[in-house]
Amino acid sequence: MPLIFVVALTSCTISRFIVYNFADVKDYKKFPSRPLASNETKFKFSNALKENYPKVLRANNDSISFENYIEKNKTLAFLIIKNDTIQYEKYFNGYSQESIIPSFSMAKSVTSILIGCAIDDKIINSIDEPITKYIPELIENGFEKVSIKHLLQMTSAIKFRESYISPFAESASFYYGNNLKRKTTNLKLKGNPGEKFEYVSGNTQLLGLVLERALKNKTITSYFQEKLWTPLEMEYDASWSTDMKNNGIEKTFCCINARARDFAKIGRLYLNKGKWNGKQIISQKWVEESTKIDKSDGSDAGYQYQ
């Protein structure tokens, strides 16, 4: 009887994993979401398409055409933009400029940017604050020494299995399951924060809960709209998937659903040190701090703020 009860409790997530299998580019159709509205004034990159990409890629005495390589790796969109001009733009596997493309883990970088915006807005005081200031429920799990910076740098030491093939891993539970707030506040530690880098999506979902608590009566999506989507004059409507239709939270480790050109504008913002057409959208200090190489003991390959 206990085994049946446990299976019943977990069956929804597991059954979704079995039915849907691995994460898919069409998953945004399966999840509830919050909308992002395009701007009335739309920023558009200029077009000057050139064939200045490598024709052939060579490695280990093998060669493959550039576009065949991209398509073979299941790429959906590939753009090269220089000086606000699109020099190469190609879509694959039936996709086009109008197609919605999921961000997957690019959402982690957006979440990092929004933490920076919240610090600029003095909604969050510092990345050195303990996350228990915003999520006091985690005190009983020993999270008092885990800071926002630890989450940003993936050195929190949370117990979280980042597996893409097991339906029992936390990554599957977070992706396919609901009630992420409960799942997040039930996380445990397996070591001391700040000692070891470990890439796990649970860090970013914790950041999402910190941000939601700091925003109080505003959703993460509405803050994203206010701080980035509208100021960056996005061309298209978009969305951010949530765990539940009612009273849900954004899946901040993944799941922003937008067009390739609009995603590229976030890159343009960082290329210009946080400025957009002369206006400082996010502080230059945050851009520099979040992208510099991290050489601390717990880092790996220079990973900084997601």
Predicted segments with their positions:
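Catalytic-site signature segments of enzymes, centered on catalytic residues
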Residues: E98, I165-D243
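Active-site SXXK
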Residues: D84, I101-I127, L151, L207-L211, ...
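Active-site helix/loop module of the DD-peptidase/beta-lactamase fold
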Residues: P102, D121-K159, N186-K188, L215-F253
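Stable alpha-helical elements in mature extracytoplasmic
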Residues: D62, F66, I127-P130, E144-I148, ...
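Penicillin-binding protein/beta-lactamase superfamily catalytic region
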Residues: T185, E195-F197, K216-K218, S222, ...
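Soluble non-cytosolic domains of exported or imported proteins
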Residues: N60, T75, I101, S105, ...
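N-terminal leader/targeting segments and the immediately adjacent pre-domain N-terminus
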Residues: V6-Y95, D121-I124
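Non-transmembrane alpha-helical segments in soluble domains
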Residues: E67-I70, G116, T132, K149-L152, ...
